[in-house]
Design a protein with these regions (language model features):
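Lumenal/extracellular ectodomains and adaptor appendage modules
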Residues: 1-184
């Protein structure tokens, strides 16, 4: 399993995107298992942090292909054998008060490579003790703090962010674009 976790900022609610690539090392299609609270069997399990809202997917809808039980979301499509046979793109917002946010994100499967990209804004401080910092990198004109972890078993990743945009704050990146400065 590979996972990419991408976070951007809106005043009062960071937006998160997660991209997962799954495979099935068996020789038969996995059709799922019974999950309490669902009528259909669940095949793949994803977790969203406490308080996540506006949950969407690229290839399916919550309440249809994807079913939510608590903070766990299950895919209901069978998983065929092979490497990287399923990709899931999940998006959500995480509302918060003030300018800091603590997130606990569960990864229920072994992960070969996790990449966390957090859009960098002036004054943003990130503490991710389980991850290795890759510094700040420019990707398509946007600066991101890069964090990584390789080869880990199922676990919870804790992330603490301070210096986020408060609910009624102006986004400094928008001000820089308006001023003609594309360096942020």
């Amino acid at each position: 399993t590979r996972a990419h976790w991408i976070m951007d900022h809106l005043p009062g609610a960071p937006l998160a995107g997660e991209i997962y690539t799954f495979g099935n090392s068996g020789d038969s299609t996995f059709v799922g298992r019974k999950v309490d609270g669902m009528n259909e069997p669940g095949t793949l399990e994803l977790h969203v942090p406490d308080g996540a809202t506006e949950i969407t997917f690229d290839n399916g809808a919550l309440g249809d292909r994807f079913q939510q039980v608590g903070n766990t979301i299950y895919d209901t499509l069978p998983v065929v054998p092979g490497v990287d046979t399923r990709q899931i793109v999940l998006r959500y917002a995480i509302p918060y008060n003030g300018t800091s946010l603590d997130i606990r994100q569960d990864f229920p499967y072994p992960v070969d490579q996790l990449s966390l990209l957090i859009a960098d804004i002036p004054g943003l401080k990130v503490d991710a003790p389980e991850l290795e910092s890759g510094g700040v990198q420019d990707l398509s004109g946007q600066s991101f703090q890069i964090w990584r972890k390789s080869g880990f078993t199922p676990q919870t990743i804790e992330l603490k962010m301070a210096g986020l945009l408060g609910e009624n704050s102006a986004d400094p990146r928008a001000a820089a674009v308006a001023a003609g400065d594309d360096s942020t």
